[in-house]
């Protein structure tokens, strides 16, 4: 018996698409399959390039929140942090957006919330910027700018976090600028701002390879590292302390200097302009004579090396125009005075300029000579250097030949057993 195919008819009441066909059996069949897709909001965490990153604590990459109603409104379970660290990296919040395409302007509210649209553009993506740790460092000397050879010098390094990421694994070591005349420290005192100071031991090896500071430096904070070194060198030599610090940030360096004490004169560098070092003129004990006499400086081992070294005047200036004068006061004792005709004769003075002043590579260059300098003890100013006579440097030195320096005293002046003193006033005149 032949089987005639049955007509399969599928339609709907609202005249939507109809299906007509034939069923190969004698029985009428109708099958309808439904595909149900569960709509959800997926949370994503990416960097500025769109690459997925480790999310903040309390959040899950790819977490899905079901849309439970046709009017579902998504709200994040908690506020997004302004910054966080994960996996050794630091991130700062840039904003978030809804959907698949990143807009030009992100929404910056920290708790994302919005009405869903059920169109495949309901996911939430939070964008964070990966921060690069950066730091600055300074090195200062906390003791005097000169040190006796064999004496100690104390230094302080200040490491400051200049980025939006914490500084970690920080180390400090000597740099290539370190002068051999400075010994390695044996310990460091590390003090985070607002924290507790701790002592870190230092060896020759760690000073070369890097001393771990054992502390992190938060965003916007700093830490100080103080250490002491022994300085050894010749008189007047400049020694440089140079350090490098690094960690999860690129290495940065700083340096400072100290000068080995001069055997004869104090050296104190003015902040702006003035005198770095001035000489003393000591004529020792002289005899009262019946005629005018010129007396030389005293000879002593502790006074300009028994005459083997010269007194000098060293100045610092910043203005392009400068001149120098000097004047001598009347020599007086407790009960007597020498006449104002008394003279201090300094002779001609070679003038030198400096390059790389106060650096280990400091060079002194002779650039000229003054005329003969004779000061009369009546406080009259005598011109020493004329305006713009010497140019091209900010540090100059006048050297006075030890054997040329004389004190001229008239006949029969002075009293036995009296000590006479007078002041030489040096006047540095500068201007634009």
Model-derived regions: residue spans:
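Signature of Gram-negative chaperone-usher
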Residues: 196-205, 263-432
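Surface-exposed interfaces of beta-sheet-rich extracellular modules
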Residues: 1-18, 76-109, 234
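Low-complexity, intrinsically disordered segments enriched in Ser/Thr together with acidic residues
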Residues: 1-5, 120-126, 130, 210-241, ...
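Serine/threonine-rich, low-complexity linker/repeat segments that form flexible spacers/stalks
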Residues: 35-62, 127-164, 254-298
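Conserved "repeat-terminator" motif of extracellular CCP/Sushi domains
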Residues: 10-13, 18-45, 103-133, 229
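Exported/extracytosolic protein signature
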Residues: 131-258
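Surface-exposed beta-strand/loop patches in extracellular or lumenal glycoproteins
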Residues: 1, 73-85, 166-180, 324
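Serine/threonine-enriched low-complexity regions used as flexible
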Residues: 1-24, 157, 228-260, 346, ...
């Amino acid at each position: 018996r032949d089987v005639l195919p049955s007509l399969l008819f599928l339609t709907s009441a609202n005249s939507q698409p109809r299906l007509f066909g034939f069923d190969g059996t004698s029985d009428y069949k109708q099958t309808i399959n439904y595909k149900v897709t569960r709509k959800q909001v997926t949370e994503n965490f990416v960097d500025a390039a769109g690459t997925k990153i480790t999310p903040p604590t309390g959040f899950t990459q790819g977490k899905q929140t079901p849309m439970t109603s046709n009017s579902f409104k998504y709200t994040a379970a908690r506020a997004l942090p302004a910054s966080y660290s994960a996996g050794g990296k630091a991130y700062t919040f840039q904003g978030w957006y809804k959907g698949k395409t990143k807009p030009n302007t992100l929404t910056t509210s920290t708790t994302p919330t919005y009405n869903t649209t059920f169109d495949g553009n309901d996911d939430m993506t939070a964008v964070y910027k990966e921060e690069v740790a950066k730091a600055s460092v300074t090195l200062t000397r906390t003791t005097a700018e000169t040190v006796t050879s064999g004496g100690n010098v104390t230094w302080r390094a200040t490491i400051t976090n200049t980025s939006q990421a914490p500084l970690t694994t920080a180390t400090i070591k000597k740099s290539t600028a370190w002068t051999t005349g400075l010994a390695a420290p044996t310990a460091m005192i590390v003090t985070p701002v607002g924290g507790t100071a701790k002592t870190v031991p230092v060896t020759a090896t760690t000073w070369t390879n890097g001393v771990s500071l054992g502390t992190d430096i938060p965003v916007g904070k700093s830490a100080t590292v103080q250490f002491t070194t022994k300085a050894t060198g010749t008189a007047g030599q400049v020694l440089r302390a140079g350090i490098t610090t690094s960690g999860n940030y690129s290495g940065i360096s700083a340096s400072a200097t100290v000068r080995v004490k001069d055997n004869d004169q104090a050296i104190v560098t003015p902040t702006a302009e003035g005198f770095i070092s001035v000489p003393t003129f000591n004529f020792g004990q002289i005899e009262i004579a019946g005629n005018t006499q010129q007396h030389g400086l005293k000879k002593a081992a502790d006074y300009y090396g028994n005459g083997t070294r010269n007194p000098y005047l060293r100045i610092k200036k910043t203005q392009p125009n400068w001149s120098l004068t000097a004047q001598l006061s009347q020599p007086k004792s407790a009960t007597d005075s020498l006449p104002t005709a008394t003279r201090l004769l300094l002779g001609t003075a070679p003038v030198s300029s400096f390059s790389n002043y106060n650096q280990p590579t400091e060079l002194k260059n002779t650039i000229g000579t003054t005329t003969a300098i004779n000061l009369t003890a009546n406080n009259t100013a005598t011109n020493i250097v004329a305006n713009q006579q010497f140019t091209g440097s900010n540090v100059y030195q006048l050297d006075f030949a030890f054997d040329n320096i004389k004190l001229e005293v008239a006949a029969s002046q002075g009293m036995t057993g009296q000590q006479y003193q007078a002041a030489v006033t040096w006047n540095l005149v500068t201007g634009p």
